[in-house]
Amino acid sequence: MGQQFSDQTQLVLNKLPEKVAKHVTLVRESGSLTYEEFLGRVAELNDMGTAKVASGQEKHLLFEVQPGSDSSAFWKVVVRVVCTKINKSTGIVEASRIMNLYQFIQLYKDITSQASGVLAQSSTSEDPDENSSSVTSCQASLWMGRVKQLTDEEECCICMDGRADLILPCAHSFCQKCIDKWSDRHRNCPICRLQMTGANESWVVSDAPTEDDMANYILNMADEAGQPHRP
């Protein structure tokens, strides 16, 4: 039964436009990701950015979980990963960006896919060191550019086209046109179905909520849900 459902889901994904299918896959993956798997991916990117692909380069990327952002039971909503580009010879931090979980998963897929190709090319070269140096001479800068793109271009989670104007307390973002059309009939998030009980339960992107804002909101929702429990 489970296999049949999985096959049907994959069949639907195959019929979707590539960009939308990729988004659906990322949302599903972030939903099933465990905390241990998340930390493993952070460590894997650090390994690729220093010990493997960028081992002979002047610059490398360092990925760290922002202290305190993963301490909540709702860590998937509030966790942040800090990506820092560092000059190895001087130790100077040249750039730094903060990503949410969805953006991090996108970057993880991009980097691991690209790195596997670079490493495969290096392994078949007659002079692996020379090939690695030429192919990945600016790898840290290229990857940092991708981080900047992900964090600068927040897209609408519905149409995947318009720039996001609003962000809901669950951290999903939408353009005004799409969320207006959805909210005519529904009072929940189109992605995760989190209920919106008030008329103003959203933030404009320019006034995006802090991690504490989102965590407190979800904790309040949990307090109001269900029946009192007496151990």
Swiss-Prot record:
Return the SMART domains for the record: RING
Which residues are the lipid attachment points (N-myristoyl glycine)?
2
Outline the residue ranges of the record's RING-type zinc fingers: 156-193
Query: How is it placed in the membrane, per its record?
Result: Lipid-anchor
InterPro entries per UniProt = RING-HC_RNF141, RNF141-like, Znf_RING, Znf_RING/FYVE/PHD, Znf_RING_CS
Query: SUPFAM superfamilies in the record, alphabetically?
Result: RING/U-box (SSF57850)
Chief localisation class = membrane
What subcellular locations does the record give?
Membrane
Xref: Pfam families = zf-RING_2
| Key words, A-Z | Lipoprotein, Membrane, Metal-binding, Myristate, Zinc, Zinc-finger
Q: Which GO terms describe its molecular function?
A: ubiquitin-protein transferase activity; zinc ion binding
Q: Which GO cellular component does the record give, naming just one?
A: membrane
User: What is an annotated GO biological process for this record, any one?
Assistant: protein autoubiquitination
The UniProt transmembrane annotation reads none
Q: Does the keyword Membrane apply?
A: yes
Q: What is the recorded function of this protein according to its Swiss-Prot or TrEMBL entry?
A: May be involved in spermatogenesis.
Protein name in UniProt: RING finger protein 141
Species name for this entry?
A: Canis lupus familiaris
Name the encoding gene, please. Answer: RNF141
